[in-house]
Swiss-Prot record:
The gene is PME23. It comes from Arabidopsis thaliana (Mouse-ear cress). Pathway: Glycan metabolism; pectin degradation; 2-dehydro-3-deoxy-D-gluconate from pectin: step 1/5. Acts in the modification of cell walls via demethylesterification of cell wall pectin. This is Probable pectinesterase/pectinesterase inhibitor 23. Its EC number is 3.1.1.11.
Length: 568
C-alpha cells in the first residue's frame, strides 16, 4: 500500500499526461446530449481540430490529416486518433501490396533475382503490418504511459525497418524496380513515419511532466507481474525454473523440453525438427538442449515460436554452421543467415554460430535477429561481412564474441552488446574493415546500437595487416545511424580517425556517434573525425544508453538468468 505522498505523485503523473492529451484537443467543445445538424457540425469541427492537433508534429501533415479525416473518425480523443492512424497505415500497406502484386510482380517474374526480391518484400510488408497490429492492440493506461509509448515506438520502428528492408532488397539487384516500389509505397511509408511522430511527441513531453518517479514504479510493477523473488517469471514451470537457474552459471546437466543430438541420444537429430515440436500458441519457455556437435542446417525460429530457449554445451562445442551468401550465391542478404530469430522472447546460451562463406562471399550473415526481447549469453558468432544482423526490436547480448570484417554488426534494432569481445578478422586484399553499420532511417526511431563494457580487438591473422587494411568503429548505413561505444577497451587495431563515411558526406550531419569513458590505445579521440554528428556525452547523457534506460532491461533481462549491468 503506498503512502499519501505516493498517491499524490501518481495523481500528478496522471494529471500531467492527461493534461497533455487535453492540450492536443484544446479546442474541443462539450458534446450535447441531443443529436441535431448543429451537433454534426460541432462534431466535425471538433474532430478536425483534434486531427490537426495530433498531426501537428508529423513530417507529412497533409497525408496525416487527409488519411485520418478520410477514415471518418467517430472520436476526437487523441489516443483513439493515433490508433486510427495505425489502422489507416495498415490499410495503405495492404492496398500498396495489392497494387504491387499487379504492376511490379509481372515485371519481377521475368527476372529470377527480381522475383526473389519481390517475394521477400511481400513477407517484409506483412511483418510491418504485424508490428502495426501490435500497436493497435496495445491497451492504453495513463498509469503506464512510459511503457505504452516505449512499446509503440519499438514496434513502429520495427515496422519502418521492415519496410526499409523491403526497399533494400530491390537495391541488391540491377533493376529500376526499386524506384517503382518507392513510388507505390510512398503514402504508406509517410503514414508510418507520421504514426511514429505522433507517438514520439507524447514521449518528448514525459520528462517535462513531473514523471520522474514513474520509471522506477513501472519497473517495480513489471517485476511484480513477471517474477518472483528469484527473478524468474511466474509463468515458468518448476522444471523450466530449475533449468534456467542452473544454466545461469554455465553449461551443465540439462533436462529440457527437447534434446537435439546427432548421436541419437536425444529426441531429435536436427534443431529444425525440435523447433517443429514447439506447441502452437506457446506462452512459456520451450527449452531446447542442443548437445555437442556441428549442425549444418539453416535454422529459423519463426514468429509462431515465441519463448524458445536454445542451450548448448558451450560455444566451442555446440556449433551451428552455414555458408549462404550474396557475393557468390546471390542470396538476398536478409536470407543468408545461418540462424534466423523471429519469435519473440528468444534466449540462447552457450552456442556457436557461424557463416563460413569467407570474405569472397560478400554479405553472409551468421545470425539475424528480428525478434523482440531477444537475449544471447555466452555465444560465439563468427563470419566476415555482415556477421551479426541486429535487424529490429529489443535485443541484448552478454559475454558473447562477434567476429568479422565489413559492417559485421549491423541493423536497426534497439540493441546493447555488453561485456562482449568484438574481433576484427583478416579481410580480402584491399578491403577496409568496419565494426558497425547501424541502420536507423527515421530520426524518431528509438533504435540504436550500444557497445557497453566490450573489448574491440583484432584476430592474430589481422594484426600484421592493420596498417594496410584499416579498421574503423563504424560507418552510417542509413541517414540517422546511431552508435554509442562506452566503457569499452579499444585496442590499436582501430584507425585514429575512428569512423568512416559511407559515401561522400552522406549522413555526416544527421548521424549520432559517441564514445564515452573508453580505454585502450585505440580510444584516443585526438585524431577522430570532426563530423557534425559526432557527439560528446555528458555523464547524464550516457545514462540514456544504459541497460535500464535504453532497453528498460530491468523488467525483462534478469528473468532470463543472464548477467546484466543496468547502469554505466
Amino acid at each position: 500500500m503506498g503512502s499519501d505522498g505516493d498517491k499524490k505523485k501518481k495523481f500528478i503523473v496522471a494529471g500531467s499526461v492527461s493534461g497533455f492529451l487535453v492540450i492536443m484537443v484544446v479546442s474541443v467543445a462539450v458534446v450535447t446530449s441531443k443529436h441535431s445538424p448543429k451537433d454534426d457540425e460541432n462534431h466535425i469541427r471538433k474532430t478536425t481540430k483534434a486531427v490537426q492537433a495530433v498531426c501537428a508534429p508529423t513530417d507529412f501533415k497533409d497525408t496525416c490529416v487527409n488519411s485520418l479525416m478520410g477514415a471518418s473518425p467517430d472520436s476526437d480523443d487523441p489516443v483513439d486518433l493515433i490508433k486510427l492512424g495505425f489502422k489507416v497505415t495498415i490499410k495503405s500497406i495492404n492496398e500498396s501490396l495489392e497494387k504491387a502484386s499487379g504492376d511490379i510482380k509481372a515485371k519481377a517474374d521475368k527476372n529470377p533475382e527480381a522475383k526473389g526480391a519481390f517475394e521477400l518484400c511481400e513477407k517484409l510488408m506483412i511483418d510491418a503490418i504485424d508490428d502495426l497490429k501490435k500497436c493497435m492492440d496495445h491497451g492504453f493506461s495513463v498509469d503506464q504511459i512510459e511503457v505504452f509509448v516505449e512499446d509503440l515506438r519499438v514496434w513502429l520502428s520495427g515496422s519502418i525497418a521492415f519496410q526499409q528492408t523491403c526497399m533494400d532488397s530491390f537495391g541488391e539487384i540491377k533493376s529500376n524496380l526499386m524506384q517503382d516500389m518507392l513510388k507505390i509505397f510512398k503514402t504508406s511509408r509517410e503514414l508510418s513515419s507520421n504514426s511514429l511522430a505522433m507517438v514520439t511527441r507524447i514521449s518528448t513531453l514525459i520528462p517535462n511532466s513531473n514523471l520522474t518517479g514513474l520509471t522506477g514504479a513501472l519497473a517495480k510493477y513489471a517485476r511484480k507481474l513477471l517474477s518472483t523473488e528469484d527473478s524468474i517469471p511466474t509463468w515458468v514451470g518448476p522444471e523450466a525454473r530449475r533449468l534456467m537457474a542452473a544454466q545461469g552459471g554455465g553449461p551443465g546437466p540439462v533436462k529440457a523440453n527437447a534434446v537435439v543430438a546427432q548421436d541419437g541420444t536425444g529426441q531429435f537429430k536436427t534443431i529444425t525438427d525440435a523447433l517443429n515440436a514447439v506447441p502452437k500458441g506457446n506462452k512459456v519457455p520451450f527449452i531446447i538442449h542442443i548437445k555437442e556437435g556441428i549442425y549444418k542446417e539453416k535454422v529459423t525460429v519463426t514468429k509462431k515460436m515465441p519463448h524458445v530457449t536454445f542451450i548448448g554445451d558451450g560455444p566451442n562445442k555446440t556449433l551451428i554452421t552455414g555458408s549462404l551468401n550474396f557475393g557468390i550465391g546471390k542470396v538476398k542478404t536478409f536470407l543468408t543467415a545461418t540462424i534466423t530469430i523471429e519469435g519473440d522472447h528468444f534466449t540462447a546460451k552457450n552456442i556457436g554460430i557461424e557463416n563460413t562463406a569467407g570474405p569472397e562471399g560478400g554479405q553472409a550473415v551468421a545470425l539475424r535477429v528480428s525478434a523482440d526481447y531477444a537475449v544471447f549469453h555466452s555465444c560465439q558468432i563468427d563470419g566476415h561481412q555482415d556477421t551479426l544482423y541486429v535487424h529490429s526490436h529489443r535485443q541484448f547480448y552478454r559475454d558473447c564474441t562477434v567476429s568479422g570484417t565489413v559492417d559485421f554488426i549491423f541493423g536497426d534494432a534497439k540493441c546493447i552488446l555488453q561485456n562482449c569481445k568484438i574481433v576484427v578478422r583478416k579481410p580480402n586484399k584491399g578491403q577496409t574493415c568496419m565494426v558497425t553499420a547501424q541502420g536507423r532511417s527515421n530520426v524518431r526511431e528509438s533504435t540504436g546500437l550500444v557497445l557497453h563494457g566490450c573489448h574491440i580487438t583484432g584476430d592474430p591473422a589481422y594484426i600484421p595487416m592493420k596498417s594496410v587494411n584499416k579498421a574503423y568503429l563504424g560507418r552510417p548505413w542509413k541517414e540517422f545511424s546511431r552508435t554509442i561505444i562506452m566503457k569499452t577497451t579499444i585496442d590499436d587495431v582501430i584507425d585514429p580517425a575512428g569512423w568512416l563515411p559511407w559515401s561522400g558526406d552522406f549522413a555526416l550531419k544527421t548521424l549520432y556517434y559517441a564514445e564515452h569513458m573508453n580505454t585502450g590505445p585505440g580510444s584516443n579521440q585526438a585524431q577522430r573525425v570532426k563530423w557534425p554528428g559526432i557527439k560528446k556525452l555528458t555523464p547524464q547523457d550516457a545514462l540514456l544508453y544504459t541497460g535500464d534506460r535504453f532497453l528498460r532491461g530491468d523488467t525483462w533481462i534478469p528473468q532470463t538468468q543472464v548477467p546484466y549491468t543496468a547502469k554505466v
